[in-house]
Amino acid sequence: MYKLNKKVIVAMSGGVDSSVTAWILKKKGYHVEGLFMKNWEEHNSDSDMHCSSKKDLSDAQGVCNQLNIFLHKVNFSFEYWENVFQKFLFEYKMGRTPNPDVLCNKEIKFKIFFEYSIQDLQAHYIATGHYVQKRIFKNKYFLLRGLDATKDQSYFLYTINQKVLKQCLFPIGHLTKCEVRKIARRINLIVAKKKDSTGICFISPQNIKKFLNHYLPHKSGNIITTLGQKIGQHYGLIHYTIGQRRGLGIGGIKGFNNIPWYVVSKDITNNSLIVSQGMNNFYLMSIGLIANELHWINDINIQNSFFCTAKIRYRHIDIPCKIVMHKKKQIKVLFERPESSVAPGQSVVFYLSDLCLGGGIIKKRLPVLK
């Protein structure tokens, strides 16, 4: 083993990815310490709704004991509440569909955690178990997709900047999930068989409806077709997103065929949910979108148009597109072909092959013209 004499703080979540990350770095000779972030205060009144951090902390501590590394424990709940959760609620209240994982990476993991590790703990680097890769060329740092296409997380990291990227390590980005689990089993990590976490980072996925009801005022309203026909009742617009099919409760309506219904828009003023039949119906299709809150990882001149690919949500195949300036701090993204279910509030992330260029927030979609 060779000694790099560099201190790195690993974001330990109690999962297999961060645990293997810590082991790889220690094996390479770094001075490794772990840090467990508590980003959410669990309250007795609603503790059944939340993903408890106690088990994750116990697992993180157990792994650090196995690897003989120190584990810092830090509470970032206030910062999370102010910089992530409040915006999350506001976006839902406005009828949009936010992505809290993008916000969490931007405001917590690659800002608060980064600053605490580099400044307070005097680390040279931070490391996470994200499935992404980093490259350097001519003193510029580039973010690439993870090797495992099914686990690539570059979509969630598009807001990272050069200063932070320079001091980030992503040791499992060149591995597949199967390879990571194989390593965990081989070295007998206590979390080798632990399931991957899913859902919003502060709430279990099965309780999202109850959770939103707890924090946001809402009321039921009409479900209306694009022709203005009332066909049902919704239970609060906050519970629906563009392109949603399941959970509408409007199947088998007399006078309509059996083609599934989809949410095509929300009428906030009249508290109405607008629906139409068929996944590729005219009202759900878009020729492009307008994006704001833009961030480019590397310098990009958007005074001139350029071609790339875009992801309009995490589990989505890249769309060939053209990017042009729209207004100040806004761009127009024109798809090569019409796309379904473009949801305002979601992130749109741009790529050149495996290189993540950056992204922005979908402000509005551009409907297919008649």
Swiss-Prot record:
InterPro entries: MnmA-like, MnmA-like_C, MnmA-like_central, MnmA-like_central_sf, Rossmann-like_a/b/a_fold. It is found in: Cytoplasm. Disulfide bonds join C104-C201. Keywords: ATP-binding, Cytoplasm, Disulfide bond, Nucleotide-binding, RNA-binding, Transferase, tRNA processing, tRNA-binding. Residues 151-153, 313-314 are annotated as: Interaction with tRNA. One of its GO terms (molecular function) is tRNA-uridine 2-sulfurtransferase activity. It holds the Pfam family tRNA_Me_trans. Its EC number is 2.8.1.13. It catalyses: S-sulfanyl-L-cysteinyl-[protein] + uridine(34) in tRNA + AH2 + ATP = 2-thiouridine(34) in tRNA + L-cysteinyl-[protein] + A + AMP + diphosphate + H(+). This is tRNA-specific 2-thiouridylase MnmA. It comes from Buchnera aphidicola subsp. Baizongia pistaciae (strain Bp). The gene is mnmA.
